[in-house]
Amino acid sequence: MTLPASRLSDDDLRARMKQFHWWHSMALRPGVTTFGGKPELLLAQEEQAFLGPFDLTGRSVIDIGAWNGFFSFAAKRRGAGRVLATDSYTWNHSAFRGREAFELARDELGLDVEGLELDPTEIDEKVGLFDVVLFIGVFYHLYDPIDALQRLRGITRQLLLVETHQDLMENPNPGMVFYPGDILNHDATNWWGPNPALMLHLLLQLGFTRVFYRDHPTLGRARGTYAAFTPEVEAGLIQQLGPPWLDLDVPGAVEALLARG
Amino acid sequence: MSEAELLQAVEAHRWLQSLRLRPNLVTSGVVPEARLVAEESALLDPLNLTGAHVLEVGAANGFFSLAARRRGAARVVATDHLAWTLPGADAQSATQWAAHALDLEVETLALDPRGLSADFGSFHVVLATAFFEQLFNPIQALRGLRSVTNRVLVLETLQNELADVRPMMTAQSRIMPFGGADGSWISGWAPNPPLMLQLLRDLGFNRVLYRNHPTLGAARGIYAALLPEAPDGLLAGFEAPWINMTSPPAG
């Protein structure tokens, strides 16, 4: 379902866009694109990498840390049923004004995507169950990401998709590095860098039964994406999980990943 | 309680710690008495517990809670979670029998430290041993401990990645000797000292002291974290091998 298109003129739309700090660069109209920190091309590559393997048709999706909503919109365009975009930090940030930016983009794109202010540390069963949970670029921004993963398990019906900064890549043992202050990229909101062995460990401990992994499409091993499936996953959700996706929950998979470099 | 009843109770329980209940009666615990005695000295000798309120988290069979009571603590609450609540676990009952046999008043409560909050109360000394290695989420549990500490947190834990200066922790699952007949798989963590320092400082402890385990060396570490409200005089008890990780004190 699409919503009625915005009645703003191109100039008025550009003026509204300038009121916000954008992270996602999105074409809202032909010739009118938000000027976000992440370029359109990179986002297109990430969308294909993160969502391409899955058939979202009719499935419910929640996007945790949606910011300007790019991946929520992408899920909707890919046929998802109910899509709920959530955020807290960037939506309440006085400079980012992420929720207003999200709503402007949503209204302009005419996509039926709900918005809910929700901090990952407060997620519980009251938010409901979703076939697909998107947790893109959030894990390492949380002081207690273990708690957040545990909460997300409780709302995942089929698939939790986690994309994160990584560290400790030379170590085959599960572990994560802590970043005090702003030592990671001069950003005081960066807290942890897990390695693939740890992500596998945490996801299996939380009751996900299958875990697949792939490097970031342009940044390589510095960032990883994990597709963690519950025992209730429907076969139809997965369209294609071939290379570069790696089945991580089989003996020797982490070691093979590290050896591959 | 007759000696026969005591013997029957000792034999009826699976003991995690070796407790001397009579001059010639020591429970056959997984952890030997000599190690526990050395740990008691390392953990408690620096502190004057006279009149103190003490909370122990992860008490197992209460060896250190009983020791705190012997050392003059006014109130001691011994708690444990997995070792007291997993199906088949009988360690809380064993603790109660031990306290009864030794005629030491120790309260016992099955408790998940992740759920601790200020509503639970306030303790001069909070003691937690074998901490990170038995917790899926030690970050949350540390917050719980902080919420009930009003002077000193003493924490003992498995450690890893000691050669790395970056703060970090590693995860592992291992069999612990409680729960079912063959024990239980427990998922936990092993931090390194730089991480412990950061986490404790982030919780508001402004003086953090450290020493290696008295018998196992750096494989296990002991931390004493003091809140700003704790008087400097408390530091006097922390002689070598203790080192002050926050010297000069953090702001």
Please give the residue ranges for each predicted region.
Chain B
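S-adenosyl-L-methionine-dependent methyltransferase catalytic module, highlighting the catalytic core
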Residues: 114-116, 123, 127-128, 136-251
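Conserved N-terminal segment of class I S-adenosyl-L-methionine
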Residues: 1-122, 170-172, 193, 218-251
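Hydrophobic adenine-recognition pocket in adenosine-nucleotide-binding enzymes
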Residues: 131
